[in-house]
Amino acid sequence: MGVQRLALALIAFTSALTSVIAAPIVIEQPPLGPEHRYDAIVIGGGPSGLSALSSLGRVRRHVLLFDEGIYRNGATRHIHDMLTNDGVEPKVFRAKARQQISRYTSTSIKDVKVTKIKKVFEHGGRKYFFQVTDKTGAMYTASKVVLGTGVLDVLPGTPGLQENFGKGIYWCPWCDGWEHRDQPLGILGPLRHVMDSVYELETLNNDIIAFVNGTEHSVEDILYLNRKYPHWRQQLKHYNVQINNKMVSSIDRLQDGSKHQDKKTWQEFDKFRVNFNDGTSVERSVFITNFPTEQHSDLPDQLGLARDPIHKNKIKVNFKGMRASVPGVFVVGDANNDGSTNGNHAMFSGKRAAVALHVELEQERAEAALGKRDESFSAEQVENEALKLIGRDTEELEELWGRK
C-alpha cells in the first residue's frame, strides 16, 4: 500500500509540474532603457559575479554585470589553488573570463559603480522588479539581482601594513602559503586567533612568532581560547610558537618577493622588519593576518538584507540557492555567510545562485502566464510543496522502490 500511495503522489506531482512547464515561455528582449528589464543584474566583477554572469549567459538570460574595479585579491601577485589557473595574475584571470563570457551575446558588462538599488512593487504588490542606479545617474531595471560585492579587510593603521598587504602579508594559507613555505613567519592579530593559524600553517612553517599587539593577557581572548582549545597553552609549546606581546609601531619591507623568487620551486622571498614601540625590532619573511572584514558595499543594507546572527559582517543566505532574506536577491562570494572565502568558493556560489535564479524566474513566469503568480511564489516553495506531496525523505523512497 505504501508503494501505491507513493506512486499516486508522484503522478499527482508530475501532473502539476507538467502543467507549469507547458505554460507559454515568456522571453524578455534586451533592454533599451529604464522601462525595459533585464532578467538579472549582477553587481560585482570578481570570480563570483563573473561565474553567475557566465552561467546565466549560457541559458540565454539577458544579464548586465556592473564592475567598479575594486577586488579583494587585487593586491595579490597571483591566484593559487584554482585548477587550470594556478599562478595566474588576478587581472589576467578576470580578462580571460570576460573574453570567454563575451560569446554569450545576451550578457553585457559596464565598468561603473552602482550607488543605489531598490525593490519596486507593482500590480498591487503582487509583482516586483529592481531598480539600479550607477554613479553617473543612469538607471536600469531587472527581475532579479545577484550581489557579488565582496568584503573589505579592516586593517589597523600600522604604517607598512596596508602598503604591503597581499605581497608577503596574506590572510589565506591556501592562496599564498606554499610560496612562502619553510620561511620564518609571523602571525598578526589578537591572541584568540593564534591557534587557528598555527593549525593551518604547521605543515608549511615551523618558525612562528605571534605578534598579538598587547592582547596576550586579554581576559576575553583567554576565555575564548579556553573554550575552543582547552589545551592551547600546551599546544603552543608543542609547536614551539612564540608569543610577542609588544605593541607594533610599523612594518618595513626589506626585500620584495616579486623580485626575489625561485620560479622552479615557486618560492617567493619577501623580508620584513617589525618595529615595536620600545625601539626594538624583529625580522620575518612572511605574515598571516587575523583581522576582521566588513561588507565592501552598502547595497545589501539599502535592500534591508538580513545579516548572519553570529557573523554580522556577512549577509545571511539560504545555502541551497544563495537566496538572501529579500525575495529576488541572491548574494554570492565572500559577502555571504556560507562559511568559505576563496576563489573556488566564489565561483561555486555564483554558479549555484545562477541556476536557482534561472529556474525560479522561469517558474514565476510560467505561473504568471497561468494567472497564478503571487509574491510568495518561489523555487524554494515548489521544493517544499513537492516534499509535502510525496511525504517521504530520500532514503525512504529508495527503500520503498527497492521492495518487490
Curated annotation (Swiss-Prot):
GO terms for cellular component: extracellular region. Its EC number is 1.8.1.9. Residues 1-22 form the signal peptide. GO terms for molecular function: thioredoxin-disulfide reductase (NADPH) activity. Its cofactor is FAD. InterPro entries: FAD/NAD-bd_sf, FAD/NAD-binding_dom, Ferredoxin-NADP_redctase_2. It catalyses: [thioredoxin]-dithiol + NADP(+) = [thioredoxin]-disulfide + NADPH + H(+). Disulfide bonds join 172-175. Glycans are attached at residue 213. It comes from the Eukaryota. Binds 1 FAD per subunit. SUPFAM superfamilies: FAD/NAD(P)-binding domain. Its main location: secreted. Keywords: Disulfide bond, FAD, Flavoprotein, Glycoprotein, NADP, Oxidoreductase, Redox-active center, Secreted, Signal. FAD binds at residues 67-75, 334-343. It holds the Pfam family Pyr_redox_2. It is an enzyme of class 1 (oxidoreductase). Homodimer. PANTHER family: THIOREDOXIN REDUCTASE 1-RELATED-RELATED (PTHR48105). Belongs to the class-II pyridine nucleotide-disulfide oxidoreductase family. This is Probable thioredoxin reductase ARB_06224. It comes from Arthroderma benhamiae (strain ATCC MYA-4681 / CBS 112371).
